[in-house]
A protein has these predicted regions:
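Helix-loop-strand module that forms the ligand-binding subsite of alpha/beta enzymes
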Residues: 1-68
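Glycine-rich phosphate/pyrophosphate-binding loop and the adjoining helix
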Residues: 57-120
Length: 120
């Protein structure tokens, strides 16, 4: 999942999508009928990529908590994250090739892990 930070949270469209998953939360925790079968849930993973404009370390607290809650609801283990603040000053992520490289590496590693676990 990828998202910018908007006022210490995730943008409305993505948040609305996540909020629409409330029935899956209820099915999983109250009715004990999760949407994802346990054998499939064990291989599901989430990588959270998030950028923020402000040069503050705490701007990711809300988005990370939301992403972790969402990953739990959809039975996708929160496997990793890539967070980049100070984008108002940086301007273009292409000015941070190390961040682009990290995004590629983390995405590749996540995909490899899923494939490896599926083949077990």
């Amino acid at each position: 999942m990828a998202s910018p930070v908007m006022t210490y949270g995730i943008p409305g469209a993505l948040k609305s999508f996540i909020d629409r998953c409330q029935p899956f939360y209820m099915a999983k925790y109250y009715r004990q009928q999760p949407l994802i079968k346990p054998d499939h849930a064990k291989i599901r993973r989430m990588l959270f990529i998030c950028i923020g404009g402000m040069d503050k370390d705490d701007i990711f607290t809300g988005p990370v908590l939301t992403a972790k809650a969402f990953s739990d609801i959809i039975d996708a283990k929160y496997a990793d994250e890539l967070l980049q603040n100070d984008m108002d000053r940086i301007g273009n992520i292409e000015k941070k090739p190390e961040v682009l490289a990290a995004a590629y590496e983390k995405g590749f590693a996540l995909g490899k892990r899923i494939v490896d676990e599926r083949e077990k």
